[in-house]
Every structure is written in C-alpha cells, then in structure tokens.
Amino acid sequence: MRHSLPYRMLRKRPMKLSTTVILMVSAVLFSVLLVVHLIYFSQISDMTRDGLANKALAVARTLADSPEIRQGLQKKPQESGIQAIAEAVRKRNDLLFIVVTDMHSLRYSHPEAQRIGQPFKGDDILKALNGEENVAINRGFLAQALRVFTPIYDENHKQIGVVAIGLELSRVTQQINDSRWSIIWSVLFGMLVGLIGTCILVNVLKKILFGLEPYEISTLFEQRQAMLQSIKEGVVAVDDRGEVTLINDAAQELLNYRKSQDDEKLSTLSHSWSQVVDVSEVLRDGTPRRDEEITIKDRLLLINTVPVRSNGVIIGAISTFRDKTEVRKLMQRLDGLVNYADALRERSHEFMNKLHVILGLLHLKSYKQLEDYILKTANNYQEEIGSLLGKIKSPVIAGFLISKINRATDLGHTLILNSESQLPDSGSEDQVATLITTLGNLIENALEALGPEPGGEISVTLHYRHGWLHCEVNDDGPGIAPDKIDHIFDKGVSTKGSERGVGLALVKQQVENLGGSIAVESEPGIFTQFFVQIPWDGERSNR
C-alpha cells in the first residue's frame, strides 16, 4: 500500500550542496555583473562620445592656430589654399569633414569642393561665431554627425573665422558598440571565473563536511540531539581549551543548571565544571579517567572522561556521569534486607537443630535435662535476638546488625549491642541508608583491625534523642597511628595499605550531607572509638 512507504521515500530530497551553491553564487554573480554592465555601459557611451569630441576639438584647435589658415582667411575662398590643408588633415584623422568659414559662415574648405564659397548649413555654428567652442549633433549635406566648432583668431586676438569638424555619428555608435561587446565578454569571463571558483569552493566544503549533504548533516544533528536527550546519563563535552560546548538535559538536571537562566552562561558553567572535573590531564595526555566518584551539589556522581580525537589530534573531551547516590541507597537498603533474611535463615537452621535436641530428649524421657535446655535456649534468645529486636525498631537495621553479629562470631570476635541502645524506625530512606553505610564501614574496619587472632570485641551503641541519633562504635584493636588520625577521613588515607581509604571518606561525606558529624578517638594498642551524629525522623515514623 502506498501509505506504508517509509517517510524518507515520500519526502522530497533537497538539492545537493554543489547545486545549491552553484545556483546561488551564479545568481549573485549575474546580478552584480548585470548591474555593473548597465552602469559601465551608460558611462562608457558618454566617455566614448566625449573622447571623440575632445579628439576633434584638439584637431580643430590645431588648425585654428595654424598661420596658413589665418593667412588664407584674408583671401578669397577659392584662392586661400585652405582646402588642401583641411583635406589632408581630414583624411589623416579619418574625419567626416573639416570646414573652415569666415565670420559670414562662408566655407573655405569642404570635402565636396563645389560647396566652397557657400554658407555653412546649420545654426549650431552660431556659438562659435560668437567666440565659444561648441559640440553638437546635427545633419549637414553629408550625414548625421557629431560636430565640433572652435573660433579662429588673428595675431591681434580678433576673431576671423571658425573651424568646424564633423565625425560621422555611425562611427561613434560603432565605437560605443565595440566597447559594449568588450564589456559583455568581460562579464561572461567573470561569470566563468566565478563558476570555476564556486566549483573549487564546493569541493573544499565537501571535504570539510566529510562529503555529507546539508540535509544529511541536519538529520545527523537531529538524531544526535534526540539521542543525547533520551539517555539518562549526563553528558558534558568540552573543547581543547576546556570550554563547555555541549550539555544534555540529564546533565543539566544533575548539575541544577538551566540554559534559560539569564545569569547562567556556558562560560560560567565551564569555570565551575573545570573546578569539579579536572580535564586538563585528559586534554594534555589523552589518558581516560574512569569511574571517578565526585560529589557535585550534594550528589554523588560516577564520572568517566575520555578524549575526543580528530586525525590523531585531541580536540576535546567528553564526560559521562550518572547519579550514584540513589543506586547506592537502594543497594544499601537491599543489603540490609538481605542481611535480615540471611540472619533469619541462620536462626531457622539453629532452631531446627534445637528442636531436634528437644525431640531426642523427649524420646529419652530426660525431662529434667529437657527443662534446663529449653530455659537456657529461651534465655539465650532473649539476650541475643529478643533484646536486639526490642531495642532496634527498624527491621532493616536489626537484620543488618544480626548479620554483623554472626559475621563477627564466625571470625572469632564478639559484636555487642550496648544494653542502653534504643533506635526507633525512621521514615527517611536516606537516613536508614546512611546509617547502614556508616555502621557497615565502621564495623568492617574494626573486624579488619582486630585481625585473624580471635577474642576481639566490638561494641555498638545507638541512642536516639530529640530528632538526633547518636552512634558509637568501639573496638579493642591496635588503634590508629597518631600521624594518621587527623587525616583518617581524607580520601586515599588508610591504615590497611595502598588502594584503600575510600570507605571512611564516603561515610563522612554522606553523614555531612545529612547535616550530621563524625569524629574519632584512638589510643594505639588499646582502643578506637568513632562518634557519629545524624538527624533521625524517629518521632515522625512512630506517629
């Protein structure tokens, strides 16, 4: 069916870049050259006519200054000898006529000798008879002509006659037409040069644009924009100077940046971005930076930065990042639930074993031993599990602590929840996730500090009061060296060797993001104690 054809097949394809550029440049060149031709042709007509008139005037002035002409005017026309001189000059300069008259307009020379002695035809001689040079177009006996007139003076500067020279008008027109054709050929040559230059320009543009047509570039741009705006990861691109050139919607949301804000410009973003993400090494050495955890405006972002190369030259860098905070919180909450389930599973196996013991004692009818065993089991449960569940109202935190108690037991150590501990459930997932992160790091650090030698003890105290949770984690391990304790929360600082020192920095960051605080005390060889204080919505959750 026709309507099922792809849209691209139904859409009319635009003209190619070469065709578009050639047509546009040709139209511009033709318009410009046409205007130049019209203006120049108008000027060249006047210039040609004026040039011929000036040439004729020069000849006329030369004759007017000739002594032979002056002397000849003192005689009768047939006896003056002026005819021979005038004809020689006329033929030499290819003129239509040279007529010398006296002050009565009687001819002393003419191409047709029989007209000598007759009056000059035309009133355009009158100005010359009054002492003024004159240029006019008029028809005489010979043809329509461009005629110039100049007065003749004697030695006393008294006018004694006039020299009239005629140029055939068809000759003037022919010279103008010759000039016009030279202009036309110049215009055509200019068009040809312009088209050749346009073809060269098109080839250069095609190379710059990788052989793509404009509509293909616009399609690629639209596809790129749609792709950038559809992905959830933030994307920020910079040029070789570190200036931000591209930012997608996800990045704007993660960075709380909006292009529409008048007070926010890409240059401002470039400055703040360079302070957060150091792209100088990537731009300089081309070394990618992968899986960096960076906090931007209370968000924990996982950033990857890679160089952008063109012909082997680094021309910029692209950073992609995503919000790791939400993922981490969900993983921590899930981890707490998994720990809770593992703890229940372990306890179910343990109680199954106890039931088998009880069943065996019943078969043996050892009722006294059975009574003692049941009482002991109940007391142990109350001390270990029942007491913990009574103090810790959050199932996630309770399951998490039970799993850590079992882990400490498996490692040969003891994890104790202080008897004065009291923790209501919180209505904030952020607070629960932060507490799990904090307790998890501090307890694991304590277990590692205690080492493989059994017998170590870890104490956890959780105390809630007036919207604040106070947490203490104490161990009797080797402690922290004095030269490291002041920097223990710095990223990369660890008592456990290289490639460590991230956990406590993350704990401090998340605690402070909630508005809380964390501190440490340690006596080498005796104890280490961490103090944590975070807001806790315990009262809201119990309403």
Curated annotation (Swiss-Prot):
Classification via Pfam families: HATPase_c, PAS, sCache_3_2, SPOB_a
* Membrane topology category: Multi-pass membrane protein
GO BP, sorted A to Z: regulation of DNA-templated transcription
The yes or no answer to whether the keyword Phosphoprotein is present is yes
Gene Ontology CC terms: plasma membrane
Q: List the disulfide bonds.
A: none
Q: Which residues lie on this side of the membrane: Cytoplasmic?
A: 1-20, 203-543
Tell me, in one coarse class, where this protein mainly resides.
membrane
Protein location: Cell inner membrane
| Post-translational note | Autophosphorylated. The phosphoryl group is rapidly transferred to DcuR.
Catalytic activity, as annotated: ATP + protein L-histidine = ADP + protein N-phospho-L-histidine
Q: Where is the Histidine kinase domain?
A: 346-538
- UniProt-recorded Gene Ontology molecular function terms: ATP binding; phosphorelay sensor kinase activity
Phosphohistidine: residues carrying this PTM? H349
Keyword Transferase annotated: yes
Q: How does it assemble?
A: Homodimer.
Q: What is known of its domains?
A: The periplasmic domain is involved in C4-dicarboxylate binding and sensing. The structural disorder in the cytoplasmic PAS domain has an important role in signal transduction to the kinase domain and may be the decisive structural feature that characterizes the activated kinase.
Matching NCBIfam families:
PRK11086.1 (NF008298)
* PANTHER family per UniProt: SENSOR HISTIDINE KINASE DCUS, TWO-COMPONENT HISTIDINE KINASE
Query: Which protein are we looking at?
Result: Sensor histidine kinase DcuS
